[in-house]
């Protein structure tokens, strides 16, 4: 469905949450945030996901990333459900806020509606959507999963690392990249510019085409 996507400014919505009223742009501030939706409280896959989010909170804190959840259940439902989440994974405290969107207007604006999943009243449910939003309030990366597939927190962390590395060093990250591994130099950077920008040097792959577009370097 059309809607919020990479490069768009996230709507500055204000919603009730488990931490009181939250205005999204104020919550972002000058940091990255992970804005994620879940189909419903007191459901099995969502319980495992939000418990994992809580367990990874320290990893996100290290990277200066804040978590912000949203679903269509009301705030009291969220608060009651958190007790189950924390009981399921003792030690994983849900310290991040979860916003309430019973009208479903926010999830529509955030492009988080699952077209195939509905509640008992026929109302659309949120998908397992996740937007990584940058300090400029723009969506940097989005994941969209169906209700039957839980998200992979290791991949979310890896994506954050890749985005922050790319932004800091003006590079790109190749397939399956992890921190400490080589990055690639974007094709818009000439070899002369690359020599200045990356004094540590770079390697160019020897390809049959003879085109020197695949260049690897290391960054700190």
From Swiss-Prot:
Segments forming domain Thioredoxin: 4-165
InterPro entries xref list: AhpC/TSA (IPR000866), Peroxiredoxin_AhpC-typ (IPR024706), Peroxiredoxin_C (IPR019479), PRX_1cys (IPR045020), Thioredoxin-like_sf (IPR036249), Thioredoxin_domain (IPR013766)
Bridged cysteine pairs (disulfide): none
Active site: 46
Coiled coil: none
GO BP terms, alphabetized: cell redox homeostasis
GO MF assignments: thioredoxin-dependent peroxiredoxin activity
SUPFAM superfamilies: Thioredoxin-like
Pfam families: 1-cysPrx_C, AhpC-TSA
Keywords: Antioxidant, Cytoplasm, Nucleus, Oxidoreductase, Peroxidase, Redox-active center, Stress response
EC number(s) on file: 1.11.1.24
Compartments where found: Nucleus; Cytoplasm
One annotated Gene Ontology cellular component of this protein: mitochondrion
Function recorded in the entry: Thiol-specific peroxidase that catalyzes the reduction of hydrogen peroxide and organic hydroperoxides to water and alcohols, respectively. Seems to contribute to the inhibition of germination during stress.
Miscellaneous information on this protein: The active site is a conserved redox-active cysteine residue, the peroxidatic cysteine (C(P)), which makes the nucleophilic attack on the peroxide substrate. The peroxide oxidizes the C(P)-SH to cysteine sulfenic acid (C(P)-SOH), which then reacts with another cysteine residue, the resolving cysteine (C(R)), to form a disulfide bridge. The disulfide is subsequently reduced by an appropriate electron donor to complete the catalytic cycle. In this 1-Cys peroxiredoxin, no C(R) is present and C(P) instead forms a disulfide with a cysteine from another protein or with a small thiol molecule.
Family statement: Belongs to the peroxiredoxin family. Prx6 subfamily.
Protein name, per record: 1-Cys peroxiredoxin A
Lineage: Eukaryota, Viridiplantae, Streptophyta, Embryophyta, Tracheophyta
């Amino acid at each position: 469905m059309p809607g919020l996507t990479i490069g768009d400014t996230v709507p500055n919505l204000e919603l009730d949450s488990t931490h009181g009223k939250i205005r999204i742009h104020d919550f972002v501030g000058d940091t990255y945030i992970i804005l994620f939706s879940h189909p419903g409280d007191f459901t099995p896959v969502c319980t495992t996901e939000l418990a994992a989010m809580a367990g990874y909170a320290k990893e996100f804190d290290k990277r200066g990333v804040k978590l912000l959840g949203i679903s269509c259940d009301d705030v009291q439902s969220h608060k009651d459900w958190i007790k189950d989440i924390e009981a399921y994974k003792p030690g994983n405290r849900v310290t991040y806020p979860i916003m309430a969107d019973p009208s479903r207007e926010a999830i529509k604006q955030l492009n988080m509606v699952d077209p195939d999943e509905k509640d008992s009243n026929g109302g659309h449910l949120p998908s397992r959507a996740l937007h990584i939003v940058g300090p400029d309030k723009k969506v940097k990366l989005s994941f969209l999963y169906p209700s039957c597939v839980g998200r992979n927190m290791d991949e979310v962390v890896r994506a954050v690392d890749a985005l922050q590395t790319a932004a800091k060093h003006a590079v790109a990250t190749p397939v399956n990249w992890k921190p400490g591994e080589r990055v690639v130099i974007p094709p818009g950077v000439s070899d002369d510019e690359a020599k200045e920008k990356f004094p540590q040097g770079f390697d160019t792959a020897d390809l049959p085409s003879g085109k020197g577009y695949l260049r690897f370097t290391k960054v700190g």
